[in-house]
Amino acid sequence: MTDIAIVDYGMGNLRSVAKALEHVAPEAVIAVTNNPEVVRKAERVVVPGQGAMPDCLRELDRLGLREAVRDAAANKPFLGICIGLQMLFDSSEEGNVSGLGIVPGRVKRFPASAMKDEKGQKLKVPHMGWNQVHQSVGHSLWKNIANDSRFYFVHSYYVEPADADSAGHSAYPFSFTCAVAKDNIFAVQFHPEKSHAAGLTLLGNFVRWKPV
């Protein structure tokens, strides 16, 4: 049996995620896969993703992975990264598409009118680079990670949960949710595989996580 399945739907640098997981869990059986049955049988599932959410959802459907991802999000330790966070939500302003509807809320674009720093200078979209993450709640995946640690971001859209599912916030320039926690799901807007020690710690915590 595969210990960790990394869902491969052709949208993201999956090798960097796999390499980071191999580093923190050298004895684990890790599969980068587009096979729905491998995803269903894995003990843990990671859904990364980069690019446009409509394209990601279309590829999930083309490969027959949508229901396997939904089943994983309902039944086993599940980590979403970047678009893997956004697609969990009900809908997105990006292409006005419906998401998987697993986490109540929506995905919104950074509004051009609000993208100014405290000096009035224009901020670029996408939000790209290192930023602090404030831990909104205590969670097993934050273990041994200092509050307000810096993680690496690349995104033009952010999530807005409808319920109290937020587990972390960042600011660009306003506060936005960058991590959600719901039952056996933990999902982040930033890229832990690119976030050096803090990111590796989070991935190691995921490998050991036993949701109640």
Curated annotation (Swiss-Prot):
InterPro entries: Class_I_gatase-like, GATASE, Imidazole-glycPsynth_HisH. It comes from the Bacteria. The keyword Amino-acid biosynthesis applies. Residues 3-212 form the Glutamine amidotransferase type-1 domain. It is found in: Cytoplasm. Pfam families: GATase. This is Imidazole glycerol phosphate synthase subunit HisH. It comes from Nitrosospira multiformis (strain ATCC 25196 / NCIMB 11849 / C 71).
